[in-house]
């Protein structure tokens, strides 16, 4: 599905009722994006939404307000960690992951973030290319980190002071 404009939302809210619905919506979007590899439960997402150190950046289709993409980060002091990024299958291959991460990195650079770290499966070439395009550098690996298929984890890092 082609998208020309998406609404960005920082997924923090003070209303507990909204947090629960947002957790359900985020879980449904993650499940749709990662139907075979979903390690985040709705309860874990709900807890993250209530955690002051966790930040969700949401992309919604303005036509139907459906969550079509999201990125989940943790910010502690000046260190940012990307836990998850997901784009629904029908919305992929349009540069939305790049746009979503670019917005989030700009936010963190303006809000005391100095360095971003993430982990990705070594076989996930599309994600690795995305991170490298956004100036992330590989700094380490964890051999056989993922128990199901013994894939390696690749650790990337980016200094937010650097320009893309």
How would you name each of these model-derived features?
Residues 87, 93-106, 110, 128-133:
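Conserved acetyl-CoA-binding loop-helix of GNAT-fold acetyltransferases
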């Amino acid at each position: 599905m082609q998208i020309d404009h998406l609404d960005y939302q920082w997924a923090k809210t003070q209303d507990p009722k909204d947090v629960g619905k947002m957790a359900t919506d985020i879980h449904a979007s993650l499940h749709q994006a990662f139907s075979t590899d979903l390690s985040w439960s709705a309860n874990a997402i709900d807890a993250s939404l209530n955690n002051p150190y966790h930040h969700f950046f949401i992309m919604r289709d303005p036509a139907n307000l459906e969550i079509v993409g999201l990125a989940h980060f943790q910010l502690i002091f000046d260190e940012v960690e990307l836990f998850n990024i997901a784009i629904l299958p029908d919305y992929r291959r349009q540069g939305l992951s790049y746009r979503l991460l670019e917005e989030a990195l700009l936010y963190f650079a303006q809000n005391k973030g100095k360095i971003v770290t993430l982990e990705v499966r070594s076989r996930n070439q599309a994600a690795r290319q995305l991170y490298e395009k956004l100036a992330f550098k590989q700094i380490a690996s964890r051999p056989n980190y993922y128990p199901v298929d013994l894939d390696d984890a690749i650790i990337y890092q980016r200094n937010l002071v650097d320009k893309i």
